[in-house]
Amino acid sequence: MIQRQSHSTIYVIDQDEALKFYRDILGFEVKTDMTMEVSGFRWLTLSPKGQPDLEVILAQVSSSPMFDADMVEEMKALVSRGAFGIGVFETDDIHGDYGRLSKQGVEFVSPPQEQFYGTEAVVKDNSGNWFSLTQPKR
């Protein structure tokens, strides 16, 4: 029986730039950063500080053995245009995080807005992926 989700993948244009965003700006912690000898594939995972049992894989589109050259170009175009929503990151201070991240140059698709489930802002990472930054109603 399935017990839990342990990993989730975010496709990125440049792993080094994505690492700076998720680690240095969002505060995620690096769990694994290694290059596989045979394939040259870089396995880069991070976790939100409050959730070390979930690892986010930052997978560079061009380095994935799953994509042929045409697919790589298609995926890069889709990622950079924001075609993928990558999920929800929870916060306990949406307005404070919005101010802090805005000052650091993070692009917001929408500012914090009240929703039935809490207060949500929509953020873009430096590859073009968007995610919801949400402070749930308690």
Where are these regions (language model features)?
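Conserved beta-strand segments that form the floor/walls of ligand-binding pockets within enzyme
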Residues: 7, 11, 45, 57, ...
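N-terminal beta-strand motif that seeds the catalytic metal site of vicinal oxygen chelate
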Residues: 1-19, 31, 37, 84-87, ...
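Short, basic, helix/turn surface patches
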Residues: 56-64, 135-138
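Conserved positions at the start
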Residues: 5, 41-43, 118
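Vicinal oxygen chelate
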Residues: 15-16, 64-130
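Core segments of cupin and vicinal oxygen chelate
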Residues: 11-61
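Active-site beta-strand termini and strand-to-loop segments that position acidic
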Residues: 47-51, 123-126, 136
